[in-house]
A protein has these predicted regions:
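Short, well-ordered beta-strand elements
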Residues: 65-67, 492-493, 501-517, 604
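Short, recurring structural edge motifs at helix starts
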Residues: 422-424, 551-558, 587-592
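Periplasmic/cell-envelope proteins involved in peptidoglycan metabolism and beta-lactam response
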Residues: 1-256, 276, 351-361, 462, ...
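Conserved "repeat-terminator" motif of extracellular CCP/Sushi domains
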Residues: 596-606
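Glycine-rich loop/hinge motif
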Residues: 540-582
Length: 606
């Protein structure tokens, strides 16, 4: 019997040792959890500014509404009040108010202070408010894709908000408090407090005024050209700063279309970075730069355009099917002659052409600090046939993002590689001091761009300022392959000042449907709008040596044969783009009687 009693006491001693010594810490923590509550203190996200210090995104205090069902005296009263004040479904609230098997349940996040105050004043049993942090965008939809937005729990979802989320979000804090068995806080019992650390502030490279100038032009495109999308950007050629960047349509960052995820996703994308397209004639800037650098051509070099070239037995047409005739390289660039650029690409050959594509960054991501960048689509060099190379010369059979194209163009017209960036550095060094072409080639390309811009006349000419430019028109392709008939992307690249560019812009019009689609008529006029307003904002003085253009009156050519119309245009110094089979003129743009600059390229439809 004594042995049995001794064994029992021994077992109890071992059990007591296990409880007190081995499991003591664990049990202490469990007990502590039962009578303490940890309250998260949400860290304010850092503020986002533009390069001038204008606020683009800022955090402010809102409130989260919770209910502790065990403390609710009248579920109907509480559910009625909250559903009315918060504009949410009564049944949903009532169901949550009845959940007595949990300590508390969330009713709504991010309630504005005014509404939270009304809830507080009603002294509803079991209803509690906790401070939260929400995001506010003072400019609504300005730079919406670039800035991006956060989720309801303050996590960056798109744009800068997502890309730099780790910097912006800060570190949440916590307060640990005593509570009773129902989870109710015991007043004055704060155990300890960890302060929230605010996120870092960011300064973006964009200038809000330039951004507004760009977006105004894009909005005009959407309205006047009835386009599917309109995109554009302004870049500092000297250092790669993105001064403005946008795609329309867009949405107000304070009123997200969360109920339509397709719209939310599509309009959140920075298409200039994510979407590839066939650039068309704007790509000719790269082809001519490579050919000039290799000494394969000169501004006085002669080319003949019959309206087509036959390559590998395949007929490839120039956009001007009746041909441009004999022309110098300077004239061919101004005419945007496809035949000339087929010749230049073939002179380069596949090996050299691809060497320059690599130098210009084609087929590679630029590394810009925006999520979702595409690398473009460059045919494997080993697969390129002669006919493919000919088409590449004028911007077909190759796909890239607009940011890739502008990265390449800026490295050519500025003479050095640039670091594209969305973040602003006050003392950022100009470019990388890494040349991709010689200074002489840069000079010649800028001359070509100034000449081409002058040829578009009325549509891009800004009196008193030397602007360079190149237009482009490219057909779109179906996802399944093959040309998507009647669908085009019209574009314009502009530079200023033409001889030594500081600024470069691009305007893209996706699927214009107002009756015309040529880049010179659809995209270039909005490039002019951007430059005009940019010069006013920058207080840019007019240049004494800028080109002064003579005015002429547009004649009535409707009903004439194409041949007679061309004779009339030649008499007064106008050029034309021709749409149709070359018969009788049925439509002209601009209409008869319009005062336009001599040298303007007009549209004739036959």
């Amino acid at each position: 019997m004594l042995l049995v009693i001794s064994f029992i006491f021994c077992a109890l001693g071992v059990r007591l040792f296990v409880i007190q010594i081995i499991n003591g810490k664990s049990l202490q923590l469990k007990a502590t959890d039962q009578w303490t509550r940890d309250l998260k203190i949400v860290a304010p996200r850092g503020t986002i500014y533009d390069r001038t210090g204008a606020t683009l995104a800022v955090s402010y205090t809102t409130y989260n509404v919770f209910v502790r069902a065990r403390e609710v005296k009248s579920p109907t009263t509480v559910a009625t009040a909250l559903s009315t004040l918060l504009n949410i479904d009564f049944d949903n609230v009532y169901q949550k108010v009845q959940k007595k098997n949990v300590s508390e349940v969330l009713i709504k996040l991010g309630v504005e202070s005014e509404i939270a105050e009304k809830i507080y004043q009603q002294k509803l049993s079991g209803v509690y408010l906790a401070e939260n942090v929400s995001r506010y965008y003072p400019n609504g939809n300005l730079a919406s894709q670039l800035i991006g937005f956060t989720s309801v729990d303050n996590v960056g979802q798109t744009g800068v908000e997502a890309y730099y989320d780790e910097l912006l979000k800060g570190q949440d804090g916590y307060s640990y408090v005593q509570s009773d068995l129902q989870g109710k806080e015991i007043g004055g019992s704060l155990r300890y407090y960890i302060q929230a650390q605010e996120g870092e502030n960011l300064y973006l490279s964009i200038d809000s005024k330039m951004q507004q100038i760009l977006e105004n032009a894009l909005n005009n495109i959407m309205q006047e050209q009835k386009a599917k999308n309109a995109s554009g950007m302004i870049i500092d050629v000297t250092n790669g700063d993105i001064l403005a960047m946008s795609t329309k349509p867009s949405f107000d960052l304070n009123e997200l279309p969360r109920d339509d995820l397709d719209i939310l996703f599509d309009q959140s994308k920075m298409k200039l970075v994510t979407d590839m397209y066939e650039p068309g004639s704007t790509f000719k800037i790269l082809t001519v730069a490579a050919a000039l650098e290799e000494g394969l051509t000169s501004l006085e070099d002669k080319f003949y355009c019959s309206g087509y070239r036959i390559v590998d037995g395949i007929k490839i047409k120039c956009w001007k099917t009746i041909g441009h005739g004999s022309q110098t390289l300077l004239e061919a660039f101004g005419n945007s002659c496809n035949c000339c650029f087929m010749d230049l690409a073939l002179r380069l050959g596949v090996e050299k052409f691809y060497q320059y594509m690599e130098k210009f960054g084609i087929g590679q991501k630029t590394g810009i600090d925006i999520s979702g960048e595409s690398s473009g689509m460059l045919m494997p060099k080993s697969s390129v046939k002669t006919v493919d190379l000919a088409r590449m010369g004028f911007g077909h059979a190759i796909a890239m993002t607009p940011i890739q194209l502008m990265n390449a163009v800026c490295s050519i017209i500025g003479g050095q590689k640039i670091d594209l960036s969305i973040l602003y550095e006050e003392n950022k060094q100009d470019s990388q001091n890494v040349s991709v072409i010689s200074s002489n080639t840069t000079k010649l390309v800028n001359q070509l761009l100034e000449y081409a811009e002058n040829k578009t006349g009325k549509y891009t000419f800004v009196e008193g300022y030397n602007v360079g430019g190149k237009t482009g028109t490219a057909q779109k392709y179906k996802e399944t392959g093959g040309i998507d008939q009647g669908k085009y992307i019209s574009s314009f690249i502009g530079t200023y000042p033409a001889d030594a560019p500081k600024y470069a812009i691009i305007v893209l019009v996706d699927e214009p449907s107002a009756g015309i689609y040529y880049g010179s008529l659809v995209a270039a006029p909005y490039g002019k709008q951007i430059f005009e307003n940019l010069f006013i904002y920058l207080n840019e003085e007019k240049q004494d040596d800028s080109v002064v253009v003579e005015k002429v009156t547009m004649p009535n050519l409707i009903g004439m044969s194409l041949g007679d119309a061309l004779i009339e245009l030649k008499k007064i110094g106008l050029y034309c783009e021709i749409e149709g089979d070359g018969g009788v003129i049925t439509k002209q743009l601009p209409p008869a009687g319009t005062s336009i600059n001599k040298g303007t390229t007009i549209l004739l439809v036959t």
